[in-house]
Amino acid sequence: MIERVGRPPGRFFRRRECWVPTWRTWVIALVVGLAGVAGVVFGVHPFLALTRPVAADVLVVEGWCDDEVMKAALTEFERNQYSTLLVTGGPVDMGAALNAYATFAEFGAANLRKMARHEVPIVPVPAPRVDRDRTYSTAVALRQWFLKQGSPPARINLVTVGPHARRSRLLFQIALGQATEVGILSIPDPKFDPDRWWTSSAGVRTVIGEFLAYAYAATLFQPTPVSAGAAVPLPTVDRPQGL
């Protein structure tokens, strides 16, 4: 009787047994993955286009926004009887030779005055030219303006466009500090359908770009002085919870 002896393991390879997923597992993984993708696609725009106003006496609008946002800001101002409408914005970066206004704050304020049906206390708050972090620089300029008037208000509401809202609120809150609560109103971007943003190039560029920009602002952003001669010290980064 010949006894079979197992082949000894080789020098370079050896046999192993391993478990692999069955087709049922792959189907479940596919369904879960598709559900996750769908959740991101349908949920990212509502997440970014945050609307959460507070009871405030001061309304702020970003001066670079289009006419629909400006009209909505005027409607909000009249409906809730604010005392002041402030317009933020840095230098106009194109067509300066054809534009009578040096900054978006001044341009936006003039635009609002033309739109208003009666006299509204509109004040432009220009920001200096910067190479990066323009939204934050306009928020710092607003903080400096408040301090020159006396002290920042306890609450403000900020009006901006679509998915820019959550990032704007975060950066304005960082710049103004915890002494001022920042409410936010997001006005739909007329360039794309917010419920089907992925069907247009404008929607894809805007939503994906704003998501990446918000992720950077919420995790990596470190403020730097916006001008060498700033008389007001910049606040340290204190990112509020839930932004």
Where are these regions (language model features)?
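N-terminal intrinsically disordered, acidic low-complexity segments at the extreme N-terminus
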Residues: 1-10
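Bulky hydrophobic/aromatic packing residues
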Residues: 64, 79, 212-213, 242
